[in-house]
A protein has these predicted regions:
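Nucleic acid-binding interface residues in structured DNA/RNA-binding domains
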Residues: 2-120
Length: 120
C-alpha cells in the first residue's frame, strides 16, 4: 500500500478521528511525538497513520497539528512542503517551544505528559 492510498483510506475513519481527538488535547507550549499520539489514540505502532491523518487536514484546520513532532524531537520534513516545516517551527516558537541549533527540541522539557482517557 502506498502512502497516498493509506492516507485516502483513513480520511474520516474512526482511527483518523481518534488521532485528531488526541492531537486536540495537546496543550499550548507542549509537543507530542507521532508514536505517543498513536498510543494515546489506542493505535500502538501506528505512528505513520498519525502522519497521514495530520497531512490530510485542511490548511485552515483548528487542530493543532504543529504540536506533533518526531521521536528525535525534530519537525519531520515533508516532501515538497518546506513551507509547512517552517510554519510548524514558527507556531511552536510562538508558543514558547525552543529548538537548538541542530533543530531539536527537548522532549523532556516540552513533551506532553498525557495518559489515555478512561471510558465512562
Amino acid at each position: 500500500m502506498t502512502a497516498a492510498r493509506g492516507r485516502a483510506s483513513t480520511t474520516g475513519s474512526d482511527s483518523h478521528q481518534r488521532i485528531l481527538a488526541v492531537v486536540r488535547r495537546i496543550p499550548r507550549g507542549r509537543v507530542a511525538t507521532y508514536g505517543q499520539v498513536a498510543v494515546l489514540a489506542g493505535l500502538p505502532r501506528q505512528a505513520r497513520l498519525v502522519g497521514y491523518a495530520l497531512h490530510a487536514l485542511h490548511s485552515d484546520s483548528a487542530v493543532p497539528w504543529h504540536r506533533v513532532i518526531n521521536a528525535q524531537g525534530r519537525v519531520s520534513p515533508r516532501a515538497g512542503q518546506s513551507a509547512a516545516d517552517t510554519t510548524q517551527r514558527i507556531r511552536l516558537a510562538a508558543e514558547g517551544v525552543r529548538f537548538d541549533a541542530s533543530g531539536r527540541t527537548s522532549l523532556k522539557r516540552y513533551g506532553w505528559r498525557a495518559t489515555a482517557r478512561r471510558s465512562p
